[in-house]
């Protein structure tokens, strides 16, 4: 008869510990997402790899405001994306342009360092970049660019 109260107490303690752990993990994830800014992403409504890149951003704690539009060429021109750096989608975060399949870790670094540039770009659609998984991965570079279109290498993957 004494075994039952002990089991009930042990079970209750285990349940409380599990509940507290789950709450701590949720709070940690919420805190991470709350600290990262919203990225506005312009993309064509039918673009599948854009959806993959957006999922990558969300997985890494970003909140994303998606703007589906068939007018991507006009948007890139209006925002000032240099023509030689274009890809399939364009993002804006904290005043920086993010062109193409830029990894979330590079966006994190950009936002931490706050360089005086217009943005980051991964020209084209290299296999193996976020949103372009599958197939044989290619080496690619993340480039910085300024308003005149001058580029430098920010990261190599």
Give residue spans per PLM region.
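Thiol/selenol-based redox catalytic cores and closely related redox-interacting motifs
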Residues: 78, 84-157
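Local sequence-structure signature of Cys/Sec-based thiol-disulfide redox active-site neighborhoods
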Residues: 34-54, 60
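N-terminal targeting signals for export/organelle localization
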Residues: 1-30
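Generic cytosolic/nucleocytoplasmic N-terminal low-complexity/intrinsically disordered segments
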Residues: 1-2, 35, 113
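Short, functional N-terminal and low-complexity linear motifs
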Residues: 22, 39-44, 57, 73-79, ...
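Stable alpha-helical elements in mature extracytoplasmic
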Residues: 46, 53, 68-71, 103-107
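N-terminal, post-signal-peptide region of Sec/Tat-exported proteins
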Residues: 52-89, 93
């Amino acid at each position: 008869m004494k075994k039952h109260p002990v089991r009930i107490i042990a079970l209750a303690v285990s349940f409380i510990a599990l509940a507290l752990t789950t709450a701590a993990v949720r709070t940690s994830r919420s805190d991470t997402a709350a600290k990262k800014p919203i990225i506005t992403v312009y993309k064509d409504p039918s673009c599948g790899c854009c959806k993959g890149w957006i999922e990558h951003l969300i997985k890494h704690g970003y909140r994303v405001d998606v703007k589906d539009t068939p007018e991507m060429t006009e948007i890139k021109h209006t925002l000032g994306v240099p023509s030689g750096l274009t890809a399939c989608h364009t993002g804006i975060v904290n005043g920086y342009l993010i062109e193409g399949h830029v990894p979330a870790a590079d966006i994190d670094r950009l936002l931490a360092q706050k360089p005086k540039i217009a943005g980051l770009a991964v020209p084209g659609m290299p296999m193996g970049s976020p949103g372009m998984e599958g197939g044989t991965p290619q080496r690619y570079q993340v480039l910085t660019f300024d308003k005149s279109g001058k580029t430098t290498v920010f990261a190599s993957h």
